[in-house]
From Swiss-Prot:
<protein>
    <recommendedName>
        <fullName>Mitochondrial outer membrane protein porin 2</fullName>
    </recommendedName>
</protein>
<keyword id="KW-0813">Transport</keyword>
<dbReference type="Pfam" id="PF01459">
    <property type="entry name" value="Porin_3"/>
</dbReference>
<keyword id="KW-0472">Membrane</keyword>
<keyword id="KW-0496">Mitochondrion</keyword>
<dbReference type="InterPro" id="IPR001925">
    <property type="entry name" value="Porin_Euk"/>
</dbReference>
<comment type="similarity">
    <text>Belongs to the eukaryotic mitochondrial porin (TC 1.B.8.1) family.</text>
</comment>
<keyword id="KW-1000">Mitochondrion outer membrane</keyword>
<dbReference type="GO" id="GO:0046930">
    <property type="term" value="C:pore complex"/>
</dbReference>
<keyword id="KW-0406">Ion transport</keyword>
<dbReference type="GO" id="GO:0015288">
    <property type="term" value="F:porin activity"/>
</dbReference>
<keyword id="KW-1134">Transmembrane beta strand</keyword>
<keyword id="KW-0812">Transmembrane</keyword>
<dbReference type="GO" id="GO:0008308">
    <property type="term" value="F:voltage-gated monoatomic anion channel activity"/>
</dbReference>
<feature type="modified residue" description="Phosphoserine">
    <location>
        <position position="76"/>
    </location>
</feature>
<comment type="function">
    <text>Forms a channel through the mitochondrial outer membrane that allows diffusion of small hydrophilic molecules. The channel adopts an open conformation at low or zero membrane potential and a closed conformation at potentials above 30-40 mV. The open state has a weak anion selectivity whereas the closed state is cation-selective. Involved in plant growth and development at the vegetative and reproductive stages. Is important for leaf and pollen development and mitochondrial membrane potential steady state. May be involved in ABA-mediated early seedling development and disease resistance.</text>
</comment>
<dbReference type="GO" id="GO:0005741">
    <property type="term" value="C:mitochondrial outer membrane"/>
</dbReference>
Length: 276
């Protein structure tokens, strides 16, 4: 693949991940195993409120093809096939879920040194079509996306964004919700290993005159333990502690509290991911 700009979905992703990844209010346990033949098997159990769910996912890579199959307790089977270099600098992703036969989807991604283009469509009679394009370089890129409903002949979305990326920082601005919202984020790393960072995000909803400002941070206590925290102008405070109990095996404890309504019970989450 080329070393050009990333996908449109990559714009603002690093800042979003620091503010959202690993924060949860559920109890989750997963264990992953790997065979000598290249098959990866992951079993996951989740308790959300009073609801229990589980799934088993398997992944197998053969030459330029990657096969993913996930079976859950709702008796649904999700299959995803990813093919790289089917044509030069091109990737194809096909997915479908059984028994929901209308869920079949095909996406094609093309990577160039100065542009990235994707097209995705649901494989049914009147599909939804999504198209994205990004121009630029790994340092600075401009992108746009649009979704079109062939049944109603209307656009379901059209958004645009810009991203500036340096080794120690990332800035992004996204005009979303058909021009009704604006999100700007900035992420800065303070060490070469990217284990300590600060992030800020400003979100503006024009139709409701709503503003949300969120700041967050990541700090590595040592090589196996890290803490994260975030706070927004609505008073929502989140924090988590993540510890590597074994190589590649993580335990994460997270919590969230409304500082403007301390009488409410805080929310707690626990996650254990084992990768022997």
């Amino acid at each position: 693949m080329s070393k050009g700009p990333g996908l449109f979905t990559d714009i603002g992703k690093k800042a979003k991940d620091l503010l959202t990844r690993d924060y949860n209010s559920d109890q989750k346990f997963s264990i992953s195993t790997y065979s000598a033949s290249g098959v990866a098997l992951t079993s996951t159990a989740l308790k959300k409120g009073g609801v229990h769910a589980a799934d088993v996912a398997t992944q197998y890579k053969y030459k330029n093809a990657l096969f993913d199959v996930k079976i859950d307790t709702d008796s649904s089977v999700l299959t995803t096939v990813t093919l790289t270099e089917i044509l030069p600098s091109t990737k194809a992703i096909a997915s479908f879920k059984v028994p929901d036969y209308n869920s079949a989807k095909l996406e094609v991604q093309y990577f160039h040194d100065h542009a990235t283009v994707t097209a995705a469509a649901a494989l049914k009679q009147n599909p939804l079509i999504d198209i994205t394009a990004t121009l630029g370089s790994p340092v600075i890129s401009f992108g746009a996306e649009a979704g079109y409903d062939t049944t109603s002949k209307t656009f379901t979305k059209y958004n645009a964004g810009i991203s500036v990326t340096k080794p120690d920082a990332c800035l992004s601005i996204i005009l979303g919700d058909k021009g009704d919202s604006l999100k700007a984020s900035y992420l800065h790393h303070f060490d070469e290993f990217k284990r300590t960072a600060a992030v800020g995000e400003v979100y503006r909803k024009f139709s409701t005159n709503e503003n949300t400002i969120t700041v967050g941070g990541l700090y590595a206590i040592d090589h196996s333990t890290a803490v994260k925290a975030k706070l927004n102008n609505h008073g929502t405070l989140g924090a988590l502690l993540q510890h590597e109990v074994l190589p590649r095996s993580l335990v994460t404890v997270s919590s969230e509290i409304d500082t403007k309504a301390l009488e409410k019970h805080p929310r707690f989450g626990l996650s254990l991911a084992l990768k022997p």
